Amino acid sequence: GCDYSAEIHSTGRHSLRARVVACHLLENESPLRIHLGIPLAKGQRMDYAIQKAVELGVEKITPLRTERSVVKLDSKRLEGKREHWHQVIIAACEQCGRARVPALEPLQALPEWSQAARFGIVLDPEDANSLRELQPPATDVHLVAGPEGGLTGREVAMLRAAGFHGVRLGRRILRTETAPVAALAAMQLLWGDF
């Protein structure tokens, strides 16, 4: 991505004309290519998780439908939410100085999303493994945390069958919006650019 310098030539009530005078290549993207799956969450939780994930360098974000997803959206409300989340992503990019806007993928069911993963991590408070015990990923990473109420045993088993590594983030159970942020920060520290 680039930042551009421009000279303003004219302004109107609802317009502006400018000429680009320089392109400044930004090299602030994470070496980790993380695709975050976020189960639909109520209130501001989804916004918070998306905002912080962008600040922490994710490449793609996919809203997920899980068995315990509390939020149910019809197609009209979903489109409005997608537009809102895209604006959250853009604002987070502006705040943290990213020139590349992470992709916001369409809503998917968890099983469908997990099939595209070559290296996956499922945050599971029941698991005994930590991120430190995993080898640094040589490919894109799919990361998923549970919704309010957590992933079901069937969902965790399905993810493991798809090759996902189960990871516990300490001894405490984290909220649905906190868990991905904590995991992303730890991943950047272990394998990324922190």
Where are each of the predicted segments found?
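RNA substrate-binding interface of SAM-dependent RNA methyltransferases
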Residues: 13-16, 21-121
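Fold-independent oxyanion-binding glycine-rich loops
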Residues: 40, 107, 123-126, 147-148, ...
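Short, solvent-exposed amphipathic alpha-helical segments in soluble enzyme
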Residues: 52-56, 136-139, 158-162, 183-184
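Structured adenosyl-cofactor binding patch, chiefly the S-adenosyl-L-methionine
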Residues: 153-194
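Residue-level recognition of oxygen-bearing side chains
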Residues: 45, 109, 150, 178-179
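A short acidic, often aromatic-flanked loop/helix-cap motif at beta-alpha or helix-coil junctions
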Residues: 108-114, 128-130, 173-174
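Active-site/ligand-binding-proximal alpha/beta "capping" segment
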Residues: 120-157, 164-168
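Short beta-strand-centered aromatic/proline hotspots
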Residues: 3-11, 21
